[in-house]
Every structure is written in structure tokens, then in C-alpha cells.
Amino acid sequence: MDQREILQKFLDEAQSKKITKEEFANEFLKLKRQSTKYKADKTYPTTVAEKPKNIKKNRYKDILPYDYSRVELSLITSDEDSSYINANFIKGVYGPKAYIATQGPLSTTLLDFWRMIWEYSVLIIVMACMEYEMGKKKCERYWAEPGEMQLEFGPFSVSCEAEKRKSDYIIRTLKVKFNSETRTIYQFHYKNWPDHDVPSSIDPILELIWDVRCYQEDDSVPICIHCSAGCGRTGVICAIDYTWMLLKDGIIPENFSVFSLIREMRTQRPSLVQTQEQYELVYNAVLELFKRQMDVIRDKHSGTESQAKHCIPEKNHTLQADSYSPNLPKSTTKAAKMMNQQRTKMEIKESSSFDFRTSEISAKEELVLHPAKSSTSFDFLELNYSFDKNADTTMKWQTKAFPIVGEPLQKHQSLDLGSLLFEGCSNSKPVNAAGRYFNSKVPITRTKSTPFELIQQRETKEVDSKENFSYLESQPHDSCFVEMQAQKVMHVSSAELNYSLPYDSKHQIRNASNVKHHDSSALGVYSYIPLVENPYFSSWPPSGTSSKMSLDLPEKQDGTVFPSSLLPTSSTSLFSYYNSHDSLSLNSPTNISSLLNQESAVLATAPRIDDEIPPPLPVRTPESFIVVEEAGEFSPNVPKSLSSAVKVKIGTSLEWGGTSEPKKFDDSVILRPSKSVKLRSPKSELHQDRSSPPPPLPERTLESFFLADEDCMQAQSIETYSTSYPDTMENSTSSKQTLKTPGKSFTRSKSLKILRNMKKSICNSCPPNKPAESVQSNNSSSFLNFGFANRFSKPKGPRNPPPTWNI
């Protein structure tokens, strides 16, 4: 399987994963479980980091370096120096120590940090955090600012020689002096990466890694990468750069996967790529790189290579002239179009300087760039990962050399990433002894480490060389088409970065806005019931919404029961959300209008419930109707403040799952009796003035009669509610409690307490009424059985009028 098929296979798999978002969550959950298992089983011990003298050197107690891969310091500058620092080596494509992943230095480890940088000859430091984040110190400042006095860290002196600001990061040129030796170290400080989160765009990260590889093109010395803990953001940069190196050299294995890569990296330092969002960021970055490379391959196979004959000599002459320059790259312009134009002008200008030397160089490089026939002999084995293998404390780094050291690493012709995304790096200076440039134009003689093995190379060595020479004679120079494809790829706009955004992502974004709108409105309505579980707060999947919920939601938008301040601004968004998933029973305007008409009909009849819904009495007299009408006379006098308060309490008890129309009717029934009772209880004298009493009883005073009549009317109202709507009382807990409270307050003992607090005159007249009641009980026991004492325990309406009414 060639590189084109491998890339296409990965793109197809990634597209399916983006459609089913759960796969990302499942994969990251496996990574977390793996780390938990390693920690519980002590698969990779951290005994050195747990020593008492080293505990204070760890920023976080749960991010400790594994013993077998930790960075050991041997450069001793004082008696207090030790060999410990919270840092690990991370394997690269061509070496076991390609990266140093470390935490942000503490105030007590600044000297250790610079000892590590100096001992391992680090040229590049990548900082992926801020000095302060969320009000907390994330990293001590180990660098100097431009124009600032040099900083002293033990025997090390650090000063800033220059600073280059990009849109999202800063490149600082630091001069570090130790004893009498001075070195130049470059710090890439990424400033727009939030902690435990991801940047909003992939482009700045790819640009950062691009610039890093312009300054250091290979793994001859490790690149130091750190954030605050040295695991989350640090792991993202390591994983992207590792994959980019594979892609550039054309050695993506058939079974390549981001999951396997990060799982292997987590065996070298704990919690690399710390969150699921960071995991998806790595996936998206790799996906973008693969898409760009596939565009180059498609254009290359369309026959555009015939347009270039002398582009390789011209380009290589530029490399020949610039490769010995002591200065670092001057053009790493972000605008790809301008860079391509400058590159074209440079090639036209230098076309006259073509000589035999450059043609000879290009002829040699054709051996590397065009192994057309011999490329089929390269079969890549599985990633050499030992995921579940137990590691000893004496575990050693192992490297695997090529079968013949010094033999060029042959690369596929279509994977020249130097002309693809690193055109600004043409003047990078060589680092390794073999003169391997970052744009991969010369043979690679580096020994190979664990990630991959090339098989059948011994058997095909002689055949490959012959085929390459024969191919060189039969084919013209064709790297100019790479140049042209580079121009095409470098024009990738930000819209192309979102090319991989499937329907699911956009769909999810739309759903998220609607869900947010629904939650805000639901919170306003149900914010008064923290102790009652409500089905609307549960997560509702897009395709599993029931019709009960969809019936309740539109009714809440009407505003007839709840206060207007609690209503959402628009009710159409909720309907559009359900309609988009075909799960709403109300998916037509006629259904909505019919529902509103039903509500208006119920509300129109609600104010006349006293007349239309009498208690079911076997024999009813006209006087009993007159008593109920008197009870309803006081309801218009209820203050608005009390009404709104009662409404809120009723509205929070919407817990049952049936249709909402009976609930609207119940709410209005609850409001009117409870309001009228509360206001009439302390004002019985007003009640006497405004209503005509029934025929006087022979042995009762007017005051005692009105107390009994109040309770009678209260019981009448309670009976109306309880007999008409038993289901609502069973299913609404808070409504029952609201109803019981005023009911109990109007027993004889509690009514006397209220009257004692409000008016002493009424309180004084209450005790004489009790003998009158006992007398009345002898004459009219049937009336007392249905009134006052039994009304609130067994709410029943009056069956017969008092015998003294002379009807």
C-alpha cells in the first residue's frame, strides 16, 4: 500500500469518526483508563520523583516523570544540585530523545531547567502557556525581555537579543552564557492557548511547528517543549510534529492512527494530551496535513510534472548558496501567496547561475527523490509500540539502525513537504554530520529508532540503485511541479481548514443553540423546585423527544399562567428544533393554533368556576347556591402581589407527564379560593357588612354564625377543587402542600390565634360562641356534621339545609 492509499484510508476513517462523535469520547476514555491502570499497577515506576527531597520540585503531585525515561542531569554547578528534574524524553521518528517534555519551571527549579538546556545542547524551547493563567502562576520567568538587564540563574546569564512577534506567538533570541561559553537559544512562546482547552484555529499551531522546524530541521538535539504541567499542550505539539515528520519523509505506516501514537507517548510521560478537546485537536491537525498532501498527490498524478525541467537545479542552487549562511531563516512569512511570489522571482533571477556543480547535486538527489519502481519494495511493519508491556526500572532505550549505516533513506516522490509548507526555510543550516537538510534534498544517514522498520532492504539494495539510475536517465527533472503544487497548497484558505467539518458538527452547533434557548426558558419556569426532579432538565437527545414534552413546551410560551418575565423571548425556536428531528407531534401551524384555542377556551371559563362546577349534591337548595356566590364575591379584591406569588408556587409543580390543559384549569382553580380565604379571615366584620346573612338562628349570635359560615365557604371551595381534580392533587406534591396549609389554619383553634393577633375585639367575642354552638348542636346536629369540624378532614359539601331556615 503506497502513501496515497494510506492517506486516503485515514481520511475516510476520520470522516466517519467525525460523523459519530462518540468514537472520540470512547477512544479518549480508553486512554484515561490506560493511564489509571498504569498508575494503580505501577507499571512505570516514579520512585525518584517521589523521594522526599524531590517532591518540592514537582509542580503537580500527580504529574511525575517515569523513572525509565526521565531526564537525568549530570552537569553539577554547586553542592546543592541533584540529578532530578521533572522532565521526560519522548521518542521521535529518528531518535529516542527527539523531545524533552517538562513542566514549567518553579522558582526552586530555574537553575535545574537551565542545567538541562545546557547539558543536552537544546537549541529550541517551545513554551505553550502563559506566565499567569486564571490568576495562578503557571511558569516562572526563565527568559529575559528585550532591553532588560540580563538575568542570573546561578552560573548562567540569560539576556534577550531580539524578539519577533507573530499573531499568536513570539520568537525570542536568547543569549545564554555559562562560564566563558555563550550559546544562542530560541524560545517560541505560544500565547493564545487556554489551559485545559484548545485554540480556536489549527493554523497558528501548524505555523508554529513550521517555524520550529525551520530553525532546527532534524532530531540531532532534543526540542524542549513545556507548558504548565508538561503533559496536555506539550503532548499536542509533540504528536503533531511527530506525524508531520512521518508525512514529510513519506513513511506513514499502513496502520497509522492518532490513538496508537498518543497511547505510546503516554507510556513515556503521564497524561500527554490531557483532555478530549486536545485529543480532537491533534486529530484535526493531522487530518488537515493529510488533506493538503492528498491535494499535492492528486495534482501530481494529473500530469503537471511535464512543465518543469530546470527547476531542481535552480532550487538547489539556492539551497547551496544559503545552506552555509550563518544566519537563520529570514523569510517565514505567514502569507503563503507572497512567499510563493518571492520564491518565483528568486528562481527566475538565479536561473542564469546554473552550473555543472548544481546539476551534479540534482542528479544525486534524484536518487532520493524519485525511487519510482523501488518504492514498491518498502513494506512498513506495524508501529513498534509495546502498549501493555510492563517496564522495569532498568528499562533501557533501544535503537534500531538501518541494515547498512550511511545508506540513504529513500522517500516517496510525492512527499516533499519542504516544498509544500516549508518554503520559507530554504536557507536553514545543516545540523547533522550527513548534511541532512530540512527539505530532505540530500540522503539521510541517521540511524533509525523504534517507531518503524523497513524490511526487504538488504535484498533490494542493489536492485534499487540500478532502477534509480535507469529511472534518472529516462525521466526529466521534475521538482518544479512540486513547486507548483506547493503554491496551490500554500493558498489553502481558512475555509479549507473547515472542509472536514461534517454535517454532524454543523448539526450539533445548531442544536446547541436551541438547547441553550430551551434550557434558559425552562430554568426560569422551574427555578423554584430544587427538590423535585423534573423531566425537562434531563438530557433530551435529538431523535428521542417524546410527544408529552413537546405538548408542554408550547403552552408555556403563552404566558397565561406564568409571569411574563419568566417566558422565553421566542417560542418558534423550540418548535424548529423539534421539527428538524421529526419528533414533535405539533409540527404544523394548525396544531399550534388549535392548542392555543383550547387554552383560551379554558381560560375564558375559569373565572366562572363557582357557577359552573357545583359540588355533586343529592338535593340542592337555592340557598346553597347563594352561599357559594357570596364566597366568590371577594375574589376580585385579591391584591396582584398575592396572585403572582401563588402563581409561581403552582407553576413549579408541573411534574406529571400528561397533557397540559387540565393543569392550566387546575391552576386557576387553586388560585381563587386560596386568595379569597387568606384575605377574608382577618376581616370578618367587612364580610358582615357586604353580604346579607341567611335567616337568623334562634340561639346564635351574628359573630359566631359568620365564623362558621367562613369555614363552610372555605370547605366548599376546597371540596370543589378536591372532588373535581383528584388526579392533579395526586401528581402535584407542591400543590397539595399549598392547599393544606391554608386549610389547617382555619380550624377553630388557629382561627382564634389569627383573630387574636389582628383584632382583640373579635378574639374576645369568640369564647362565648362555644356554648351557643353546643346548644345549636342539639337542635341542628346534621348541619354541624357537615360543617366546621369535619370540613377539613373530610371535605364534603352541605347535604341538607339547617332545619331552622324555614324553607
UniProtKB/Swiss-Prot annotation:
What name has this protein been given in UniProt?
Tyrosine-protein phosphatase non-receptor type 22
Q: Outcome of residue 201 to F?
A: Moderately reduces phosphatase activity
Q: Which GO terms describe its biological process?
A: autophagy; cellular response to muramyl dipeptide; lipid metabolic process; lipopolysaccharide-mediated signaling pathway; negative regulation of autophagy; negative regulation of gene expression; negative regulation of interleukin-6 production; negative regulation of interleukin-8 production
Q: Where does substrate bind?
A: 227-233, 274
What post-translational modification information does the record give? Phosphorylation on Ser-35 by PKC/PRKCD abrogates its ability to dephosphorylate and inactivate the SRC family kinases.
Q: Which chemical reaction does it catalyze?
A: O-phospho-L-tyrosyl-[protein] + H2O = L-tyrosyl-[protein] + phosphate; N-(5Z,8Z,11Z,14Z-eicosatetraenoyl)-ethanolamine phosphate + H2O = N-(5Z,8Z,11Z,14Z-eicosatetraenoyl)-ethanolamine + phosphate
Kindly give the InterPro entries that the UniProt entry links to this protein: Prot-tyrosine_phosphatase-like, PTN12/18/22, PTN22_cat, PTP_cat, PTPN22, Tyr_Pase_AS, Tyr_Pase_cat, Tyr_Pase_dom
Q: Which organism is it from?
A: Homo sapiens (Human)
Q: How is its activity regulated?
A: Down-regulated by phosphorylation.
